[in-house]
């Protein structure tokens, strides 16, 4: 595999020209694919069912991928027209950002997506990454060490020269409200806005593996993975729903005077409910987290049976939890020793749950209802806090 770093000096002298020449093309691309109102319907077979934000339609010689704006459901965030190299140049393509597939040279901003691409068997097509320190995929780490995978720096301000040298077929990024991609947008490289993290249900998010499957020419593999995930998730949720008791569950803790709790339409609320738990804020309309002070949380959830905390090392103890805020010790789960922590510095929790929510669901069922419902007595991510 070539080492693109060797060409950095060559590109410096012509980068300004590249940006100038590509600006017009980038503008045309963005106008045709992004920020429009509700998209015109296209005829074909719909490939998605659970996702609220992603719609894939197979139109025969190409696939249309519509991504709804998570912050304004009346508008389209992006429309991509995925055209296989084997299809040549089909006539009558709908408006949208054209992406030739399969991707063979991609720049990926998130380790979560790299993990899913690995599962599809296409990890060799990941030739560049941003925020390299957060990637745990072994093949990517080895590539970074050997130089086969380029580190382009921070996803918030990637090294434009390195990106130009890499010349990826596409960039996979996570969009944020009212944000832009800076100079990267002027290179004319398709930016695939992976808004999967904004989905409100676990299976809705997991279904985004189908988009990756289309991008990397792995539809069969993506369909197979999603089918297995969906079946296992549904089986576990059905078993949990049959439980006679449902514990009240709180998540995270007070940090800098703010406690983030899951809104009623959030991903976390969905998976807590599916695992047989009760989210105290399940009746709220919020699709994300709600910011509260300690008094508000305590008033509604002081009698919580289970307390789940994600913590990036070092190991957290009950005494440390109490010393960080004394009234933590008056929460029922604390008093009964039912506080569980996932150390995200060592576990693969963040890498696993987006595309394999059945793993997290099984763990929650074990913690909420016990091994008879979970089918296992071993945890993978969470451990009970010691004194």
Model-derived segments and spans:
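A short, structured surface patch at a secondary-structure boundary
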Residues: 66, 71-164, 170-173
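Flexible, glycine-rich surface segments
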Residues: 231, 236-322
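Bacterial Sec-exported substrate-binding components of ABC uptake systems
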Residues: 31-114, 221-250, 335, 348, ...
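Second-shell loop/turn segments in exported
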Residues: 96, 101-105, 116, 148-154, ...
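Bacterial N-terminal signal peptides
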Residues: 14-30
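Structured C-terminal subdomain patch of bacterial secreted/periplasmic proteins
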Residues: 199, 203-228, 309-387
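Extracytoplasmic ligand-binding site segments that recognize negatively charged/polar headgroups
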Residues: 104, 112-113, 129-139, 179, ...
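Bacterial N-terminal signal peptides that target proteins for export
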Residues: 2-18
């Amino acid at each position: 595999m070539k080492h693109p770093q060797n060409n950095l000096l060559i590109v410096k002298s012509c980068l300004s020209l590249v940006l100038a020449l590509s600006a017009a093309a980038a503008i045309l691309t963005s106008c045709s694919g992004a920020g429009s109102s509700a998209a015109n319907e296209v005829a074909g077979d719909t490939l998605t069912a659970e996702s609220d934000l992603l719609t894939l339609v197979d139109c025969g010689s190409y696939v249309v991928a519509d991504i709804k704006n998570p912050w304004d459901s009346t508008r389209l965030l992006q429309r991509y027209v995925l055209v296989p190299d084997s299809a040549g140049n089909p006539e009558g393509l709908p408006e949208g950002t054209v992406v030739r597939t399969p991707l063979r040279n991609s720049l990926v901003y998130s380790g979560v997506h790299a993990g899913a691409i690995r599962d599809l068997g296409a990890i060799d097509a990941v030739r560049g990454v941003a925020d390299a320190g957060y990637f745990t995929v072994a093949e990517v780490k080895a590539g970074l060490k050997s130089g086969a995978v380029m580190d382009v720096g921070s996803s918030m301000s990637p090294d434009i020269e390195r990106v130009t040298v890499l010349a990826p077929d596409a960039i996979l990024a996570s969009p944020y409200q009212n944000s832009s991609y800076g100079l990267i947008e002027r290179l004319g490289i398709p930016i695939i806005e992976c808004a999967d993290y904004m989905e409100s249900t676990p299976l809705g998010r997991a279904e985004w593996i189908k988009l990756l499957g289309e991008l990397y020419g792995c539809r069969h593999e993506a369909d197979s993975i999603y089918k297995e995930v969906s079946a296992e998730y549904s089986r576990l949720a059905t078993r949990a729903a049959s439980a006679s008791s449902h514990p009240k569950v709180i998540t995270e803790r007070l940090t800098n005077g703010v406690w983030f709790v899951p809104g009623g339409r959030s991903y976390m609320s969905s998976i807590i409910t599916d695992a047989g738990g009760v989210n105290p804020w399940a009746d709220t309309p919020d699709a994300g987290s709600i910011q509260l002070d300690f008094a508000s949380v305590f008033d509604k959830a002081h009698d919580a049976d289970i307390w789940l905390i994600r913590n990036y090392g070092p190991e957290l103890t009950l005494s440390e939890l109490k010393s960080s805020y004394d009234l933590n010790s008056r929460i029922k789960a604390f008093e009964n020793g039912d506080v569980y922590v996932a150390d995200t510095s060592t576990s693969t929790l963040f890498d696993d749950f987006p595309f394999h929510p059945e793993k997290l669901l099984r763990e929650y069922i074990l913690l909420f209802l016990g091994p008879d419902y979970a089918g296992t007595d071993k945890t993978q991510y969470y451990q009970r806090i010691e004194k």
